[in-house]
A protein has these predicted regions:
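Hydrophobic, aromatic-enriched alpha-helical segments typical of multi-pass transmembrane helices
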Residues: 2-234
Length: 234
């Protein structure tokens, strides 16, 4: 490899490593958020109590959600980069859903930060305000579909990774089970939620490691036929 080729490959390596790290970090941050979350459910009384008694945890959860949402962009970017032919359409859909889901988590983080201003006001008024905010039709029509997109996004990302030979069937099948479980298990079961997020971290962390260990030739936009990624066996 000459000096020019080596210099040109450096930005591509940075992009690869950023994508790999983001695939691991975005679900790991959600594990932290779920373990600390003092405001599960988001009702007026819950938000007021959390902002009064555990404002630090509320800030930590907000930051975790917002950074997790931001990291969805480089995370799906790594998958999109590898979807050249096989699985390209599914990966494109996964990218769109994943980024929209990231917006949803960013919105929840902002909601948590806004709740920090609740203490100090008249309690019933503050509780009623959050209730009205939750019941706002425009909010429901915009934010809740974005939150739904996150679950659909991680599901599509896992199947897209399988289609592009980055992971074995255990990954998308497990993620599918997690998403379905999240829909059928009642809210307010933190241990189950944390366990599900840990599994997502394992799956997407594996994908991150897999992408991080690709050679420059495998990561190149147009690899030679003999440099195409070998299918995942695990």
């Amino acid at each position: 490899m000459n000096t020019a080729d080596h210099t040109a490959s450096f930005p591509h390596r940075i992009r690869r490593y950023a994508s790999a790290a983001s695939l691991l970090a975005f679900p790991a941050l959600l594990v932290v958020e779920a373990a600390l979350d003092p405001a599960a459910g988001g009702t007026g009384q819950v938000m007021l109590t959390a902002a009064t008694n555990r404002p630090g945890a509320l800030v930590a959860c907000a930051v975790s959600l917002m950074f997790s949402g931001i990291l969805m962009v480089p995370a799906v970017g790594g998958l999109l980069h590898q979807a050249r032919d096989r699985g390209a359409a599914l990966t494109t859909l996964a990218g769109a859903l994943g980024v929209l889901g990231g917006f949803g988590h960013f919105a929840i983080g902002m909601f948590y930060l806004v709740a920090l201003a609740l203490p100090g006001g008249e309690q019933n008024e503050m509780v009623a305000y959050v209730g009205r905010l939750n019941d706002t039709p425009a909010l429901g029509a915009i934010v809740f579909p974005l939150i739904l997109c996150f679950g659909l996004g991680v599901l599509a990302m896992a199947w897209a990774a399988w289609r592009t030979c980055l992971i074995g069937l255990w990954g998308p099948i497990g993620v599918t089970a997690v998403v379905v479980l999240h829909e059928v298990v009642p809210t307010g079961t933190p241990l189950i939620e944390i366990a599900a997020l840990v599994f997502l971290t394992v799956v997407f962390g594996y994908l991150g490691i897999r992408i991080g260990r690709l050679s420059d030739a495998e990561w190149a936009p147009n690899p030679q036929a003999h440099e195409v990624i070998a299918p995942a066996t695990a």
